Amino acid sequence: MAKPTRKRRVKKDIESGVAHIHATFNNTIVMITDVHGNALAWSSAGALGFKGSRKSTPFAAQMAAEAAAKSAQEHGLKTVEVTVKGPGSGRESAIRALAAAGLEVTAIRDVTPVPHNGARPPKRRRV
């Protein structure tokens, strides 16, 4: 039986896109898409090898944003709009890392979902 050949990654020539930063209390996920929502690159603190409570640090979010920006720039990305979702500690540092990586940030939008008194929240932690 013939060995299945892996598809070669096609270089998409896209100038502008959207960086979605999903910052939870436990992890930070950075996904860079084109304006239609098709994924170009993604990275997360966990995917970079951070484990446990180190995933939720601002430094881990910074590294995730740098990794996603680097692979998105290989597709020709130059400008990016940022949408931030979630209450995590990596929100600010991920945005700064995208700008420092050479992407021009044109807009920052907070799209954190706010319930209109929907489901009951989890009980308070007693440490």
UniProtKB/Swiss-Prot annotation:
**GO molecular function list:** rRNA binding; structural constituent of ribosome
Q: Which GO terms describe its biological process?
A: translation
What HAMAP family is this protein classified in? Ribosomal_uS11 (MF_01310)
Q: Which gene encodes it?
A: rpsK
The task this protein performs is described as: Located on the platform of the 30S subunit, it bridges several disparate RNA helices of the 16S rRNA. Forms part of the Shine-Dalgarno cleft in the 70S ribosome.
Family statement: Belongs to the universal ribosomal protein uS11 family.
The alphabetized UniProt keywords are: Ribonucleoprotein, Ribosomal protein, RNA-binding, rRNA-binding
* Assembly mode: Part of the 30S ribosomal subunit. Interacts with proteins S7 and S18. Binds to IF-3.
Q: Do you know which InterPro entries this protein is assigned to?
A: Ribosomal_uS11, Ribosomal_uS11_bac-type, Ribosomal_uS11_CS, Ribosomal_uS11_sf
Taken from the record, one Pfam family name reads Ribosomal_S11
Q: What is this protein called?
A: Small ribosomal subunit protein uS11
